[in-house]
Amino acid sequence: MVDEKSRIGRAGEHLVAFYLLQYCDSVILTNENSKADLILDHSDRLYKVQVKSTNSIWKHKGKEYYRWDFRPGRYRPDDSEKIRYTASDVDIYALVAIPLGKVLFVPYNTDMKSISKRIEDFEKLDTRESLEEALNIINHVPSLKPFK
């Protein structure tokens, strides 16, 4: 039986793939052992996508947030610290709020350890715009065009 955390993660990956397939040439779901969760092909360029999904609310100073941690669940062989993603592992993070069915795309940044977004701000999010902005920051790619 699959645990709930794994189900939330897989649901997020499939939701991200759904959004990406509307605008990009192809999307490949990788296997569990890969550093990236999805490979995205857009305008003849491949991007590695790491999906982070949450189903819970983080409360801080009376406000409600969704929060994502950018560290994989793996530790160094000596258990000294969690391994961090590198630029060779990830091009884009896809941050999924499962309760809203929305995705925020952000380009990889070496300084990011976690990110939180107020729920009310996430509700207003335009997923397509966030993907377009992330791709533009990474590589000045052409505009996204949905299928008809």
Locate the predicted segments by residue.
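Mixed-charge (Asp/Glu-Lys/Arg
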Residues: 1-34, 40-148
